[in-house]
């Protein structure tokens, strides 16, 4: 057999070459980013994950490599050995970390060629816009590009910072929980896996490690974390994937204050380590009720104002029928004051058929009433104008802090509908009017969520977070209206994490199961192992989980989590690279005792 080829080891990554290496001989490996022929001297940009360095092939100084340099093309894989030189001062490139140096290619070896036309340019300087479908189909090429390569490295840095903080400073241990488990109702549909050795029975892929991490607390692990893979079979949006990654944590003998304080220090450590940003502590807090009242959302973007104002008392017994009807039916009247909106927003946009009308009706509102604040008067439709006395007009201006030139937009109806529609309108106008400062960074906690919400389709209560969340101790007398000891972390209007103190007493857990409609038999069948564990000495405990993909997305300044995941699925839950999901052979289905009833077309 021929002897194995021995190549010199890499001495540096391309992006690490600096003026300190001038005069040294280095060996580099990477991809050709660009090739330029300038009057007989060939310049090559060599790229790896660390960056780009310029190579020089000169027929006078490096004759052995010059001929090969003429053959290389973009994305050829090469090895180069050569001496580091300082670039002429007039050819410094301030855009590159290596822009003051170049490597004279004394040896050049082509390791791999490109055998067909590239589907798109990998070079970052081409400025080529590539459809996402093409990028996902050739993801291995897309990941060579500077932006995605940087995002993957940022993701690694975030995970490394998490591990160092939790393990080295806080005494957490990383424990892997099962991927093949049993199906339990947690909201979204499970991905099911048939068991070949137990015909007719199924595993489910975990939507979260929730139950196992609670059992780890029963087991005395005390402080657990995991970079956990989770799976949910749900309709996808820009910020959702069928498989995703969580930073999952659980802690014994810690109350809510201690958990929030520890997590603030964790977030501060991450931001300082990967972005060099010092976050102020403590983070602001809003209760769920405050967030809904002021922003119409349980994940408010607090970088700008435009807060909602409840003016329901002002319109009690109003002669304006729309408002009177809403209040008689137990609803609310709220105002979204828009400073300077009188000139910026036309009546056409507010009335039926207008874009703002369509926006609020999309979320259940019947429409928008409005008042334009003019010097010395309020301008609106006759019926609303006539329903307001001069004293009420003044009270309205005081409540909303409105000035001449402002626009008041009204929502009337059930509180949930008014909050949702005006909250969405607030975000839309905040962006449209340029009220959101780009570089602002607002993190806050939302606390005191309701324990349950009503599911109108199924005519029953269901857990707002999950049925293992502990009720507030002051609300145990009536669980149906209880507050939850739950908390969400919101960053610029995006929920990046959420958690709670957990139920650790069997009798309370059984009451919660009963409240969401599980019979004792159903509770034992689905969660008997958890209920039994609570009989053997369970510590008070709580935890939190962060959407790691979403956290990295925000740190990277991206708009979609697909741009911070190496091999994401499309919004149709497909992998365009491998063709998954795909059909399987009849033999495989037979072994699993499974038959497909799907009929194409």
UniProtKB/Swiss-Prot annotation:
Keywords: Aminoacyl-tRNA synthetase, ATP-binding, Cytoplasm, Ligase, Nucleotide-binding, Protein biosynthesis. Aspartyl-tRNA synthetase with relaxed tRNA specificity since it is able to aspartylate not only its cognate tRNA(Asp) but also tRNA(Asn). Reaction proceeds in two steps: L-aspartate is first activated by ATP to form Asp-AMP and then transferred to the acceptor end of tRNA(Asp/Asn). One of its GO terms (cellular component) is cytoplasm. NCBIfam families: aspS_bact (TIGR00459), PRK00476.1 (NF001750). GO terms for molecular function: aspartate-tRNA ligase activity; aspartate-tRNA(Asn) ligase activity; ATP binding; nucleic acid binding. Homodimer. Coiled coil: none annotated. InterPro entries: Aa-tRNA-synt_II, aa-tRNA-synth_II, aa-tRNA-synth_II/BPL/LPL, Asp-tRNA-ligase_1, Asp-tRNA-ligase_1_N, Asp/Asn-tRNA-synth_IIb, AspRS_core, GAD-like_sf. ATP binds at residues 232-234, 241, 495, 547-550. SUPFAM superfamilies: Class II aaRS and biotin synthetases, GAD domain-like, Nucleic acid-binding proteins. It holds the Pfam family tRNA-synt_2. Its EC number is 6.1.1.23. It is found in: Cytoplasm. GO terms for biological process: aspartyl-tRNA aminoacylation. This is Aspartate--tRNA(Asp/Asn) ligase. L-aspartate binds at residues 186, 232, 465, 502. Residues 210-213 are annotated as: Aspartate. HAMAP family: Asp_tRNA_synth_type1. Belongs to the class-II aminoacyl-tRNA synthetase family. Type 1 subfamily. The record marks 38 as: Important for tRNA non-discrimination. It is an enzyme of class 6 (ligase). It catalyses: tRNA(Asx) + L-aspartate + ATP = L-aspartyl-tRNA(Asx) + AMP + diphosphate. The gene is aspS.
